[in-house]
Curated annotation (Swiss-Prot):
Keyword Transcription regulation among record annotations: no
Lineage: Bacteria, Pseudomonadati, Campylobacterota, Epsilonproteobacteria, Campylobacterales
Protein name (record): 4-hydroxy-3-methylbut-2-enyl diphosphate reductase
Pathway, per record: Isoprenoid biosynthesis; dimethylallyl diphosphate biosynthesis; dimethylallyl diphosphate from (2E)-4-hydroxy-3-methylbutenyl diphosphate: step 1/1; Isoprenoid biosynthesis; isopentenyl diphosphate biosynthesis via DXP pathway; isopentenyl diphosphate from 1-deoxy-D-xylulose 5-phosphate: step 6/6
Keywords associated with the record: 4Fe-4S, Iron, Iron-sulfur, Isoprene biosynthesis, Metal-binding, Oxidoreductase
GO MF terms held by the record: 4 iron, 4 sulfur cluster binding; 4-hydroxy-3-methylbut-2-enyl diphosphate reductase activity; metal ion binding
Pfam families: LYTB (PF02401)
Role: Catalyzes the conversion of 1-hydroxy-2-methyl-2-(E)-butenyl 4-diphosphate (HMBPP) into a mixture of isopentenyl diphosphate (IPP) and dimethylallyl diphosphate (DMAPP). Acts in the terminal step of the DOXP/MEP pathway for isoprenoid precursor biosynthesis.
Residues of the active site: E122 (proton donor)
Length: 274
């Protein structure tokens, strides 16, 4: 099987930084899952004794705590500070940016519209910085059902697709008196998505490697399927199915921002033997 890798794929700056932080802070707790890749989390726990804790009330005083890449709600961060735990913040700088924008714009009286998944930890963290109730929408259709104010500020979950953000921005501009638009989709996400789109037009089958709970990985799969219907998401080489590759000659591979090189290489090696 011939293999072609996407031009851009895999670990982004924020994930690399977070993993380095975890490796340097052995025996710490991580408040929530550091990244959305279970196998890499297991590696960190096994080799560096960093463990996940989801409940801030269960974190002991004076304990070393790492904040996940997606950030956490403002009230949880304040709780940890008041409790006296030692905080190491691994929040991606690209996530901190929309947090700051939401806080600033809501204080100025803008209604916050956030394009994202309301259940995603990044989104939960970002909207916690709003001083008034924020609207969270995952599509233009969802936005069309919402009541809008005259002054609106638009931000996005960092892993969303730019064309869909532009659709929402256009809708708001047509209906609101004043609209502030902030493109908070991170550069690495945009590059990876474009590379996946370009590659999907060339190949017979596309394999997306990454965690099944990872937003950016699921976006890559969605993009790949636009031009390559035989696109599949796998967490590692063990999930590859031989039947997928029947009568296929060229396989494209991309990977989510939380996918380590060692997993990508294992997938690549197995496909090369088919």
């Amino acid at each position: 099987m011939e293999i072609k890798m996407a031009k851009d794929y895999g670990f982004c700056f924020g994930v690399k930084r977070a993993i380095q932080i975890a490796e340097k802070n052995q025996n710490s707790l991580i408040f929530g899952s550091l990244i959305h890749n279970a196998k890499e989390i297991n590696r960190l726990e096994k080799n560096f004794n960093v463990k996940i804790e989801e409940d801030p009330k269960k974190i002991p005083k004076n304990k070393s705590v790492i904040i996940r890449t997606h950030g956490i709600p403002k009230q949880d961060l304040e709780y940890l500070k008041n409790k006296g735990v030692k905080i190491t913040d691994a929040t991606c700088p690209y996530v901190i940016k929309p947090q700051q924008i939401v806080e600033s714009m809501s204080k100025e009286g803008y209604q916050i519209v956030l394009f994202g998944d309301i259940n995603h930890p990044e989104v939960k963290g970002v909207i916690s910085y709003a001083t008034n109730q924020a609207l969270v929408v995952n599509s233009l259709e969802e936005l069309q059902e919402k009541k809008l104010q005259r002054k609106v500020a638009l931000v996005s979950q960092t892993t969303k697709q730019t064309p869909k953000l532009l659709q929402i921005a256009s809708y708001l501009v047509e209906r609101c008196t004043e609209v502030r638009i902030f493109n908070t989709i991170c550069n690495a996400t945009s590059y990876n998505q474009k590379a996946a789109l370009d590659l999907s037009k060339e190949v017979d089958i596309m394999i997306v490697v990454g965690g099944k709970t990872s937003s950016n990985t699921k976006q890559l799969l969605s993009i790949a399927k636009q031009h390559c219907k035989d696109s599949y998401l796998v967490e590692d080489e063990n999930e590859l199915e031989l039947a997928w590759f029947k009568d296929k000659k060229l396989c494209g591979i991309t990977a989510g921002a939380s996918t380590p090189d060692w997993i990508i290489e294992n997938v690549k090696q197995k496909i090369s033997t088919i």
